[in-house]
Amino acid sequence: MVKLADITEIIPIPEDVTVTINGSEVTVKGNGGEIKRNFNHNKITISNDEENVTVKVAFPNKKDKAMVGTIRSHISNMIYGVDHGFTYKMKIVYAHFPMTVKVQGKIVTIDNFLGERSPRKAKIIGDDVKVSVKGEDVTITGINKEHVGQTMANIEQATKIKGRDPRIFQDGIYLVDKRQEELE
């Protein structure tokens, strides 16, 4: 099989966003805030000019090709996050025992889940993630897609039902909508 000479991925930078590259650390600043991330990979080089970020690898093997695509996606998500932000919407569902959900600092507390006396807790990941509860709707917003997604998963996993038939006991907090929305 013939090896490719190089693979280059180009990511456009919007006008409101600034990308700074220091070695393998990429910093993206925009209206929503700032995200830093270290992409330490031996063969891959990341460079930028005013308009584009370039991710390049010379004589790649299969893993290097995959890593170039992964780094491109991460940088694209960072740029989109600081420019627009990410919003996940969840719905509180219960049949008999009305659960109450509260945000206390960096913890989401779920009381009275299936009538349990002890509250269930979910951790909010990252400093930029905001969780709000209005009625039966839970909204998670932030600029880092990974932190927003992991916080959503933590809340969903906190209400996982064990030892009961999941076809009957469908109480929980479930993802309803994933959106990339404009920052206010």
Curated annotation (Swiss-Prot):
This is Large ribosomal subunit protein uL6. Belongs to the universal ribosomal protein uL6 family. Transmembrane segments: none annotated. This protein binds to the 23S rRNA, and is important in its secondary structure. It is located near the subunit interface in the base of the L7/L12 stalk, and near the tRNA binding site of the peptidyltransferase center. The keyword rRNA-binding applies. One of its GO terms (cellular component) is cytosolic large ribosomal subunit. GO terms for molecular function: rRNA binding; structural constituent of ribosome. It comes from Methanosphaera stadtmanae (strain ATCC 43021 / DSM 3091 / JCM 11832 / MCB-3). Keywords: Ribonucleoprotein, Ribosomal protein, RNA-binding, rRNA-binding. GO terms for biological process: cytoplasmic translation. Part of the 50S ribosomal subunit. The gene is rpl6.
